[in-house]
Curated annotation (Swiss-Prot):
Keywords: Amino-acid biosynthesis, Aromatic amino acid biosynthesis, Cobalt, Cytoplasm, Lyase, Metal-binding, NAD, Nucleotide-binding, Zinc. Its EC number is 4.2.3.4. Pfam families: DHQ_synthase, DHQS_C. CDD domains: DHQS. Belongs to the sugar phosphate cyclases superfamily. Dehydroquinate synthase family. It comes from Picrophilus torridus (strain ATCC 700027 / DSM 9790 / JCM 10055 / NBRC 100828 / KAW 2/3). One of its GO terms (biological process) is chorismate biosynthetic process. This is 3-dehydroquinate synthase. Its cofactor is NAD(+); Co(2+); Zn(2+). It catalyses: 7-phospho-2-dehydro-3-deoxy-D-arabino-heptonate = 3-dehydroquinate + phosphate.
Length: 338
């Protein structure tokens, strides 16, 4: 796939394929361009053809003032100009930090994205959001800033656990926005792997269909992209981040589909549970969860407004609406979870 999309005021080129990164070696090494590379990715893959590089740690620790300052200092020391580009090669945290640095250095320089996880390829690299954490608050400081080029090299996707995290996000979009995506993922693992490039393309198109109408996230149209995340983020906090994002979102989708049913929508919670189980996600035994403590995390969700909790309620595949619940209503429904 080699297509161009308009997003906000920008035109973004997205190229998807296998073993394609070296095809862009000249562009990546052009002028004062500098690559910010995840340490894990740099250790695992031969990226010696990339000449001008900064290696950073993985994970939320890198999304900090410390690492931002390190990058800005390197850009200054290497006399990087505004017309040059930052290239990031890594997962979502590498992209968040690099995108923010590109957006503020000399009021904005070029940005090229090379997401190396399925999660980053189908989700975090699309939509322009970036940021760093501050005072233990996630993504407190950030901007909306698009890459001019996204290179989705599927040869990086060779870790089963990381692939599952990405499939959870693709399934989310298949349930709410793109039924064809749902139908592909609702298959055996071999079929899914054979169709991974198609999954990436459909996921990108699904997300772009939403963010292109609400680039700066002002109209609440992006709410649908949070299906499974209101509960999922709460589960991550509840378990002290000892479960992966994909596992949290997968379980969040099961629970939010159950909530949807309780609100009078079509019951697809068992269908979603079956797919998630087949994908290999661990399904949380909700009977062992302290509902009151979980509710406290749910109430902290950034999409909550005026004391009400906003949920993406699914009403069949490809159909959804936003429902607002009081904490008392949420507690009552969660208390009845099987």
């Amino acid at each position: 796939m080699d297509l161009k999309y308009k997003l906000g005021n920008d035109v973004i080129r997205i190229v998807t394929g296998k073993n394609i990164l070296k095809d862009f070696a000249c562009e990546l090494n052009s002028g004062g361009n500098i690559s910010i590379i995840s340490r894990n990715v740099y250790k695992k893959y031969d990226l010696s053809f990339i000449k001008n590089r900064i290696i950073i740690d993985d994970g939320e620790r890198a999304k900090s003032m410390e690492y931002l300052t390190l990058i800005i200092n390197e850009l200054l020391n290497k006399r990087v100009e505004r017309g040059d580009s930052i290239i990031y090669i890594g997962g979502g945290t590498t992209g968040d930090l690099s995108g923010f640095a590109a957006s503020i250095y000399k009021r904005g320089m070029g940005l090229i994205a090379v997401p190396t996880t399925l999660l980053a390829q189908v989700d975090s690299s699309i939509g322009g959001k970036n940021g760093i954490n501050y005072m233990n608050i996630k993504n407190l400081i950030g901007t909306f800033y698009n890459p001019k080029l996204i290179i989705d090299d599927i040869s990086f996707i060779d870790d089963k656990k990381l692939m599952m995290d990405g499939l959870a996000e693709s399934l989310k979009m298949g349930i709410t926005i793109e039924p064809e995506l749902f139908n592909i993922i609702n298959n055996d693992p071999d079929y899914i792997i054979e169709n991974i490039e198609r999954i990436i393309t459909l996921s990108i198109n699904a997300k772009l269909s939403i963010v292109s109408k609400d680039f700066h996230d002002k109209k609440h149209l992006r709410y649908v992209l949070n299906f499974g995340h209101t509960i999922g983020h709460a589960l991550e906090s509840y378990f002290n981040n000892n479960i992966s994002h994909g596992e949290a979102v997968a379980n969040g989708m099961i629970i939010e589909a159950y909530i949807s049913k309780c609100l009078g929508n079509a019951d697809i919670s068992n269908e979603i549970r079956s797919i998630i189980k087949r994908l290999g996600f661990k399904i949380i035994d909700f009977r062992s969860v302290d509902i009151n403590r979980l509710l406290e995390y749910i109430k902290n969700d950034k999409k909550s407004e005026s004391g009400y909790i906003n949920i993406v309620a699914v009403n069949g595949i490809g159909r959804y609406k936003i429902e607002a619940l009081s904490p008392e209503e949420m507690l009552k429904i969660l208390g009845g979870m099987p």
